[in-house]
Each structure stands twice: as structure tokens, then as C-alpha cells.
């Protein structure tokens, strides 16, 4: 323990280029620890960590862990990884990323945001609010925050704002002082097995809050509302519901912004604006308004913070415009996220929407096939490409072709299956001036936007 507290520990990350791992590594580097890491390929993230003083290796090899005190892994790292095997052979502790994150949080008051969707945006907004209020928080986010130029920020204040990952249950390792839950949908059932087990996991997460802490819960979501009787700590709710402690009314969607009136029970807090698309982002902002109010931050400061929020990369990010076509990129890959993003795009821009969607993981495609079948109703044209495996093995029946058939069977009139290598060219043939093109998915479909723009500019 003294080794870690004195910042003499040598910490190695396997898969350091991952969005969850790199943020923790960056904070540790800025705190003065010796940090090394390995990844399969070079990226902007690994180059940034190397520039901060990290020793980065490409490829996984036993020699990478010979001089380290602890090895940090994510759930994506296989048990037979040579660095993990060598560390265990040498009796070097091998810990999940959440355990290292929890160790950092013990030094601060932790604000942890969890939920099936919206947690990256909400975490980023919360960190921005605390920074704007002069609290100088540390933050670890699951996406690159435009204002930080990174997915992490080391602050000198007493607060740490983190995105809590429920996918493998690791969020039960972290100790939040304030816990926010945005929603709970059936997801990651390869780990949780049943929706009820997932729901119980969120109950346990919220109840990790200390007696002096707080839970902030979205009452609009039925599963979140269902955990209220099981919450043992002080809790406030938010949403459009008239039963919410913090309520949003008169939501207005206009271009790249959402505006709404916020109330604390029946007391008006004012009209707020955030430069994000979609009704769901009004609720994400409302969670942050509730956080600020409960922390004693004046509503005027919160209003200014939300108005100046610059967003997160791959959350309805405009990639460019060419030949009268606007190209937008978004990380949404769950049916609820897809539906909300497409609905927000149509409501805000009132243009023809061409969606380029890449399913993410065979398990998700299999488990949520029916939900995906109705998620694309707000896309005039859907170009569906190959499943991004994310390390999974193929599953019989869980194919892009079967998904395309399901979407057509549920009534969509314009669905085309396109190989990933041909996606940009296929899109060029379908778009026309005035269209909004939306690349959607957590895989490499993000590159299809710039590819399309290059073709349109010729």
C-alpha cells in the first residue's frame, strides 16, 4: 500500500489503447506514477499516452511485464494473454480496471454515472459542470470530451467524476459518493444472464453510496423506477414525469440544440439549453441539473455550464458537408440508442435521413434482433453492413443478413445489405443534396463518414 500511495508503483495496462483503460492510465501518469502499456496497434490514444511519458509496446509479450508491480486488465483481455500468464507466474497482481479506478476514487468524493445509454454524455456534462463551478474535478470518461481533448482530466479538487461500466459487473467495485442512473435496458446478458440479475446489479451499485451520499435516478425509465423500493440510501428522481423531483417541461428541439424548462418539484429553476441533439439529451442534462442543485451549485452557474458544453466525440458529431450532404457520426449501437438518435436527427433537422449502420457483437445482434427490427423507422434509407465482432466468435443465425430480413419483415421499405469495404461507395449512389447521412455503430463504421465525404468532394 505504501508503494502505491508514494506513487512509486510501476503499473502496466494490457490493452492500454481502450477507451476505459487509457483514461485511468492518463490520470496515473499525470499523478506521477510509472505507467506502461501494450496494445495490438498504434492509435491516437497510445501516441498521446506515450507523449505523457507512458512506455507503450505494440503486441503482447511476456517481457512487457518483467519490471512492473501490478498489471491492469479489462474484461476484453483473454485469460491466455502472454502478459497475464507471465504476471501470474511471477505472482504479480493482475487486477480489473475497475479495481484501479476504485483505488483512485478512494482519494476523492466520487460521482459515478451508470446506465445502459447516455452515461458518457452525462459523465462529460457533469465533469464540465463541476469544472465550470470552480471545483476542478478529476474525470475519467468513456469517450473523448471535446473540452478536455481527451477522455480523462486530472483536477486538484476533491471530486472525481467517472463513467461506471455495468457490462461486466465491474461497477460494483467502485465507491461512489453520488450515483446517477440514466436507464436500465436488457444488455450485456452474456454476463448478467437475466434482466432481473442486471436490475439487481444496479440496486447493489446504488446502495454502495454511503449514508451521507445520494442517488439520482431517472424515474421516466420503468426499470429504474422499479428499483426505487430497493434503494436504501437517499435518492432523488428526475424526468418528464410529474412524480419526478427534478422535472423537464416544454422541451424544444432545434438544430444542434435542445432547450427545456427545469423544475425542482414545483419551483422553477429556469430555461436551459445544451448543444446536443435529441429529446434524450434533455434528460441527460436534467440529471446534471439535479446533481448541481443537490451539490449547492446555483442554477445560473449550471445554465452557463450546459450552454458552453462542447460535447463528446462520436456523439452526434458532424464530420463535414459535401455536395449538399451533411455527414454525422454517432456511437449508438443498442436499439434504444439507435432509435433515439434517428428520432433526434429527424426532429431537429427535418431532412431525409440516410443511415449507415454496423451491428456490434454477435451476442447483441442475436439477443436484440426483435428490438433492432423496429429501431430504424426514422431512417428513410438504411444501409446495413457486416457485424463488427469485437473479439466474439460468429453465432449461427446472428448475421447482418438475418437482421436485414427482420427489419424488412417489420415493415421498413428501404434496407440494403452492403459489405463494409463498399459502404461509402454505396452511400454515394443513394444520397442526394439536402440529405443527412448518419453513421451509427461502435465499430469501424465511423471511418465510412470521411470516406463518403472524400467521394462526394471529387
UniProtKB/Swiss-Prot annotation:
Binding site for ATP: 115-121
Taxonomic source organism: Anaeromyxobacter sp. (strain K)
SUPFAM superfamilies: MurCD N-terminal domain, MurD-like peptide ligases, catalytic domain, MurD-like peptide ligases, peptide-binding domain
EC number(s) on file: 6.3.2.8
Domain of life of the native organism: Bacteria
Gene responsible for this protein: murC
Its job: Cell wall formation.
Pathway membership, UniProt: Cell wall biogenesis; peptidoglycan biosynthesis
UniProt name for this protein: UDP-N-acetylmuramate--L-alanine ligase
Localization per Swiss-Prot or TrEMBL: Cytoplasm
Keywords for the protein's UniProt record, in alphabetical order: ATP-binding, Cell cycle, Cell division, Cell shape, Cell wall biogenesis/degradation, Cytoplasm, Ligase, Nucleotide-binding, Peptidoglycan synthesis
GO molecular function per UniProt: ATP binding; UDP-N-acetylmuramate-L-alanine ligase activity
Family stated for the protein in its record: Belongs to the MurCDEF family.
Any one of the GO BP annotations: regulation of cell shape
